[in-house]
Amino acid sequence: MNKNKSIDFVQIKNIFESISNEYDFMNDLMTLRNHSKWKKEIAEIAIASSPKRILDIATGTGDIAINLSKINGSKIEGVDISDNMLKVARKKIKELKINNINFKTCEAENLVFEDNHFDIISIGYGVRNFSNLEKGLNESYRVLKKDGKLIILETSIPENPIIKFLYT
């Protein structure tokens, strides 16, 4: 995980560009399909706030944004550094006939939105890939309304030695 070290942006982008078509399958395998449940829980947390403007950072193939799109009256912006991941996301929303999500290529460390704009910001499995953790989180808080919620979904390396072995 990124512990505020500078990570090579180009390297991260290239990785996600190359795995975009397999990404969802890989998530199914690595989480034993639990990622779908965890992503739905983000939407459940968000619903309590009745948000109108939502930003999904590191949206990838759009799963979290799609779950959030079910919130009545909401408008979702999904951003990611990978054009190929966003192509998969756009294909999904077209097939599902979802029209309240807009995807764009954008770095978490340099968001293209005005200050205090979003009611909710979600980041699923993205914080670890920020090229600069502090800058990425500062940008998130810049565009989040003062009474808004930042919801982060991340995995960690388990402490149980038997399970930990599977992560190495």
What are these regions, as identified by a protein language model?
Residues 80-81, 132, 155:
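Short beta->alpha hinge that forms the Motif I/post-I loop of the SAM-binding pocket
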Residues 1-24:
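N-terminal, positively charged/glycine-rich alpha-helical extensions of SAM-dependent methyltransferases
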Residues 109-120:
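A short acidic, Gly/Pro-enriched loop at the edge of an enzyme's catalytic core
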Residues 134-146:
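A short glycine-rich, Lys/Arg-flanked "PGG" loop and its adjoining helix->strand segment in the class I
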Residues 53-57, 61-110:
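Class I SAM-dependent methyltransferase SAM/SAH-binding core
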Residues 119-132:
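A short SAM/SAH-binding and catalytic strip from SAM-dependent methyltransferases
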Residues 149-168:
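Conserved class I S-adenosyl-L-methionine
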Residues 32-52:
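Conserved alpha-helix/loop element of class I SAM-dependent methyltransferases that forms part
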